[in-house]
Amino acid sequence: VLTGLSTDYLPSGCVPWQYILEDTDSYVSVYKELGYKTMAVHPYTSSFYNRKAAYPKIGIDELHFDDDIYALGEELGLTIRGRQISDDTFASAIEYYLDKNSDSPVFLFGISMENPQPYPDKFETPDIEVRNDAFDESTANAVTNFATGVSDADKCLKRLVDYIDNRDRDTILVWFGDHLPTLGG
């Protein structure tokens, strides 16, 4: 999405970031040339998918991963949902970094981490229960936990929209999923 490069010619199942070996034009680099601060927020390990090495090559200057979020834990109201840093904490981190850089335009690329697989028994107390006679117990648990994660993502989106609506700075929010869920397939 950030580079506009197609993955059609890459090996199936590969990690596209591993192919970013030199400076590569991207939407990020365009904003950087226009004077924007460029940053990424991802509440997971920096080595995953080679992000720490690849992001600077597409123009991202500031990288904030799980260790940064844990360090700001109290300030952000750190919570864990399932096995990951919650989407609510992810929203807090985005607000924190935007507020911290309110004196300049910012391009911030954020990737949440609360709702990836595995889904069975992910949340101790899911907010949503999905039952269907066609589902065995394992499938019902996976769908229930996935739906709870989607609900949390929806709350995160609403929180960010409300935050943006109350900012004194023009802000564009682009929200998308970067892959389909793996629900036992």
Regions found by a protein language model. Name each.
Residues 1-185:
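Solvent-exposed soluble domains appended to multi-pass membrane proteins
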